[in-house]
């Protein structure tokens, strides 16, 4: 099912959406933060999706607990370190960890640039202990508005040498991409690649805007592209990568079932598409789970899964030499 001769990658993986349950428990008690449960065992349902629960509101509440316990920069560093460990332990050869420093900082009024530094330090420490390649993607959380995104952008650009790309995430309908054109001009001027959450809550026009105005070469989720034949043709022709996260799409009610997920439609249209975990801590999944789901629920063959695996390597924000090194390590 997973081809061991091809690097296994996860390109759409939120660092701040992957905080271990025991870490939430320990940090909560360490910092005197009131938690919604009185034991580690009973905490899990408040911070992780249970069974077939599918609700965007419930999902976001669980996600909020992941950052509620980030009371100081040491906590941020710990979570970043554990993200590297989790990536390695799940069998990944390469992961791009994306994070929103404003979202991580807001509960306890941490310095945004300090959060970025703590993430970088935690990842560096993790890479000393675990054999996995990691790159970082900064996120601007559009839901907090343009001014907050400017603060976030400045904190991230102060450490641009530690980033490969920038992302736009959050409320796609309330805060359309047009509001952030100037922000992304600064991103392009800084020489960073661009991905954007688009076509998830909004229609295909949001994806066109992300590609044509923000400069995105990859799109997160993008499920609504299938309703726009011209866009599908454009995506395939220009190798715009779709970072697909089927289980997360189900958990957030972006799709009503795996059977309704458009992954197969993208594949058949020749669009470059990869499998990813999104918020693995909230969804309680790993990348192997997504490949199992792709086979059993999305009905992909082993040959198609291998193609998806290769797509991920092609889509990665890596140089050609880095890509070759990933493949060489699999021989």
UniProtKB/Swiss-Prot annotation:
Q: Which PANTHER family match?
A: ADENOSINE DEAMINASE
Family of this protein: Belongs to the metallo-dependent hydrolases superfamily. Adenosine and AMP deaminases family. Adenosine deaminase subfamily.
Q: What does this protein do?
A: Catalyzes the hydrolytic deamination of adenosine and 2-deoxyadenosine.
Q: Which UniProt keywords apply?
A: Hydrolase, Metal-binding, Nucleotide metabolism, Zinc
Which residues take part in binding substrate? 14, 16, 170, 279
Listed GO CC annotations: cytosol
Q: What is this protein called?
A: Adenosine deaminase
Which species is this UniProt entry from? Shewanella putrefaciens (strain CN-32 / ATCC BAA-453)
Q: Which GO terms describe its biological process?
A: adenosine catabolic process; hypoxanthine salvage; inosine biosynthetic process; nucleotide metabolic process; purine ribonucleoside monophosphate biosynthetic process
Gene that this polypeptide is encoded by: add
